[in-house]
Amino acid sequence: MKKNKWLFIVALSTIMVSACQQDDQQSSPDDSNPSNEQQEQTEDQSAPDDSNQAENEDEPAEEEEEPFDEETMSLPTEYFNEIEEVDGQAIIQNPDNILTFVNHDFLLPSDYEPEDLVIPDVKFSYGHQDIPKSYMREEAAGALEALFAAANEEDIELAAVSGYRSYDRQQELYDQAVSKSGPDQEFVANPGSSEHQSGLAMDVSSASVNYSLVQEYEDTEEGQWLSENAHHFGFIIRYQKDKEDITGYGYEPWHLRYVGEAAIEIYENQLALEEFFDLVKEI
């Protein structure tokens, strides 16, 4: 894939908060995590038919249509947010979209819960538990399994820490943070603005940092491997270093967001998802 070089002039005035505020250790039993997750504590032969094979050889193989065109930087309309303003907020109306664009400006509906949530077959920092944060959407979960398998082959130890989180759970965390630190607290995302609710995000850590979610993870062998390889499996580091003014969130080397094939273009050009959607054309 050829690389493009772009110059961006970005003027966004958003507050910087940590996007991955997960349940602190005194949360309810069905969503607790015993690991030390500092950023979020501020708080699962028959023989071939030769005749059919001959017929199939005469027919061109059907290729699955890929939504993202890297040559034209274009996407079909259905991969863009459909927005409806509700009480002064921009609410996403097509949240099942794999490229759903969630941030401070575009919120998920309060009643949205993905219908295809599954537990990926990967290592978790708290062991295998059937609790909400173990889940991801099915496509993202399969990609996470492939990523973890590739890491394991290179003796890179990864552990999933926190995936899906409901709107109501995010509201609880937000209320707790405001009660503790006041309305100007900068640690817990507002309900609706967390990518975890989409089922497309997973926080990942390793034993080298005691399975905590800390910026020092970028300096570990595991964190570096993740940064350099996640895009091969459809994931991006959603909240990048030196992109805080664009994303509105602090640097989170642990936060993976599944975007499918667009991940390669985003990675190779070091784009934030905000920048990607500024550039990509709607068709």
Give, region by region, the residue ranges found by the protein language model.
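Extracytoplasmic cell-surface/polysaccharide-interacting catalytic and binding patches
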Residues: 21-161, 168-283
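C-terminal motif of bacterial Sec signal peptides marking the signal peptidase cleavage site
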Residues: 16-19
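Positively charged n-region of N-terminal signal peptides that target proteins for export
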Residues: 1-6
